[in-house]
Design a protein with these regions (language model features):
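Iron-sulfur cluster-binding electron-transfer modules in prokaryotic oxidoreductases
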Residues: 1-288
Length: 288
């Protein structure tokens, strides 16, 4: 199965383990990832508050390249990239003058024919039906499915899942053998946009997320966003100072959990790249 793939910047940098796990499950399940050629950064910064035209030109060029290279849909694992590409599609569909201005900057034709899928949509569409027969090591743990902001908001643009109580990741985890908890912070912001400028706020926001998950019995927090993973995993010392207690709960990408359940190795899934060790029996069983 040949599927277009846009990694974005994070999957080649701070979230290499996400990239590795996406590629690994694809290989194991017969998916031929075809990376978009000549891709650029999607502009997932605060640029949209300074220069709207430029902030739309960057993701529009990606979409135009996908059309030019013959893709009808592309999988975008990074939630921030998924958000920016989807917002660009929405803005151009609803404002012809803006579309003309942006395409003048981009210098490529764009028809709006490419469908953008986040990683949860991809799993639901291409993997979910075959998944039960592929599981060799059920992920039998209590988990907190954390969606964050960018997969869901703005909801009028993304139209993905339920805004207040999304269920797509919960459904995937249940099939993998996990028990998703009911908790209050599954769509709260982790403070990713402030991860450099206001680490104190990141400590509070991310700390509240981990504290609630841990207090409700979760053994792991599951994410589908590189920014969320970086804050919840990498900022653990800041979080611990805010909470005044150590948080040892690991944070895994949904693709890593899927990979563990179908028998892939810790190396294939990039588990050693985490700041907080993944001390779960499934991870220990697949160290080879």
């Amino acid at each position: 199965m040949r599927i277009g793939f846009y990694p974005g910047c994070s999957l080649n940098g701070t979230s290499r383990e996400y990239n590795e796990s996406v590629k690994a499950i694809g290989k194991a399940l017969g998916i031929d990832w075809v990376e978009l050629k000549d891709w650029n950064c999607c502009g997932a910064t605060a640029a949209h508050s300074m220069n709207k035209e430029l902030s739309l030109a960057l993701p529009t060029r990606i979409l135009a390249l996908a059309e030019k290279q013959g893709f009808q849909e592309i999988v975008v694992p990074c939630a921030s990239c998924y958000n920016r590409l989807s917002v660009a599609q929405y803005e151009l569909e609803n404002n012809e003058k803006l579309k003309d201005d942006v395409l003048t900057v981009v210098g490529l034709p764009y028809l709006g024919t490419v469908k953008v899928l986040n990683v949860l949509q991809f799993i639901e569409k291409y993997i979910l039906d075959i998944l039960p027969d592929k599981i060799v090591r059920p992920f039998a743990h209590q988990v907190a499915c954390y969606y964050g902001c960018l997969l869901l908001r703005p909801h009028k643009v993304l139209k993905f899942d339920r805004l207040e109580d999304p269920q797509s990741m919960d459904k995937i985890m249940s099939i993998l053998g996990a028990n998703p908890i009911d908790w209050a912070f599954k769509t709260e912001c982790c403070g990713a946009g402030l991860s450099v400028s206001r680490t104190d706020l990141v400590g509070r926001l991310s700390g509240n997320i981990l504290k609630d998950a841990s207090d409700r019995g979760a053994e792991a927090v599951i994410v589908a966003c590189p920014m969320c993973h970086s804050n919840l995993d990498m900022r653990r010392s800041t979080i611990n100072r805010h909470l005044m207690e150590p948080m040892t709960i690991p944070v895994l990408y949904v693709t890593q959990v899927l990979g563990l359940a179908i028998g892939l190795s810790a190396k294939d899934l990039g588990l050693k790249r985490h700041f907080v060790g993944v001390n779960l029996k499934e991870a220990e069983l697949c160290q080879e």
